Amino acid sequence: MKKTRCIFPALTLLFLVCPVGAEAADEEQVRPNIILLMGDDHGWEEVGYNGHPYVKTPYLDEMAASGLRLDNFYAQPVCSPTRGNVLTGRHPNRYGTFTPGRSIRPEEVTVAHLLSDAGYATGHFGKWHVGPVKKTSPTNPGAMGFDEWLSHDNFFELDPVLSRNGGPPQKFYGESSEILIDEAINYIEKKKQADAPFFTVIWFGSPHEPYSGIETDLLLYQDLPEKYNDVTVRLTSNETGEKVKRPLRDVLIERYAEITAMDRSIGKLRNALKTLGLSDNTLLWYCGDNGIPPSGLRESRFRGYKGQLYENGIRVPGVIEWPAGIPEPRVSSVNAITSDILPTVCQLAGAATPDVPLDGINLMPLLNGKMNERVEPIKFWYFRGDQKAEKSAKPYIAPELQTGTTPLVKKMGGLLTRNFKNFHHPEIREQDFVGARAILTDDYKLVIEGEKGMGVELFDLKKDPGEQNNLASAHPEIVKRLSKQLRDWQGGVMNSLMGRDYTSSTSLKSATESDVSDGKAKPF
């Protein structure tokens, strides 16, 4: 059942962009089809176009060479928070999705809801990870705005087990990225026959551990340097789902094979769109969901890893291909983040945006080549929740509705299914403002407690992308100003966490050019 929302602003907007009469149908067709693609644990360096010495990604390289390459694109430091971020345009702490395994809240209005209201067909394929995908879940893809879905509660490898529209889990045989793309292409073909614009979200299970690959992809990386045999990493066993230690070289061979298979699948999708005559006015947006995990990390120009707010934890590949809207290739160094996807996509689709605090901005000026800097800083906050307080906290969703059904290849708490949780937060306390946090401007990045005991760090990423030179003591006035901005924003996030954004009927706000023409976030 779809959420009850005030749709009058959306209808008004559609009248504005779709003239009445014969021209209306033509104008309606101008709106692009939209496909969001996301790799799982795919870091910024792990693509050919960013100069990786080993990873082969010819199709992502083609997208970067023909479309808009986002060199400073960011995500949350871990998985579920980024997925919630994409769906809502809001920081995940606003609705309690602090870490992997925390569900989204049913009241959240998603980009799928908004585009469905605007006349788009909506489909989800692959990893969900913001709640169970079963029919009874109030946060399954259908409840969060998708008309059709073939999804998994968490992550998967070869021969994945997926649920179609909340039905019993079904095993598919083959490389998981290829399976998702084949299913998505079938979906797109049906929508073309129905003459419906489509919004399709494809969230791959690759290259998340435990790693695996088909033989032809594994053979591509047999020449990796032997020096990686001297390093041992801890990760999940494909056979048992338990933690094991393995040589880094063996792990990288499998990890890179997964990336190449995912890339090849993206190439198959691009070719299918061309065959169907849809490629010109279909926007493809690829990104990773967080940075490189320790189990997949070799030498790097960046500091940190998945789960941290240093560059290797949050900086990810970002590329947009849309021939009709981005006819010439461009490279952008403007800071952008996954929360920008919702306001941007809504503007593209002529859809409304929810009348709640958003953390993303509309990037249409960037797509149009009219945005050279980001006025609104990007804020990060990795708060893991108060484990002690949650023992007595009231669950936000009944626990029986939060149990997963799609089998994992990795044990979570001794179980081979993913169960979710979310809690009511009745009051704001001083101890709620802890955790790693950061604020990124065009000039500086302030990091607080990025690692235990590190305190306050200030970096000039243009001169020091590796975050090695802490400028905090040299610029106390900048530290003070950015710290205040970050703390003030945290207060607003905590208000959201307490449920103060929700009303009985979540209203929508029209996205108009006046709201977004300068690339600034506007107050509601």
Q: Which residues does each PLM region occupy?
A:
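Bacterial N-terminal signal peptides that target proteins for export
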Residues: 1-10
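Short hydrophobic transmembrane-like helices used for membrane targeting/insertion
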Residues: 7, 17-20
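Formylglycine-dependent sulfatase
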Residues: 12-15, 22-450, 454-457, 465-485, ...
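Carbohydrate-binding/catalytic loop surfaces
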Residues: 508-510
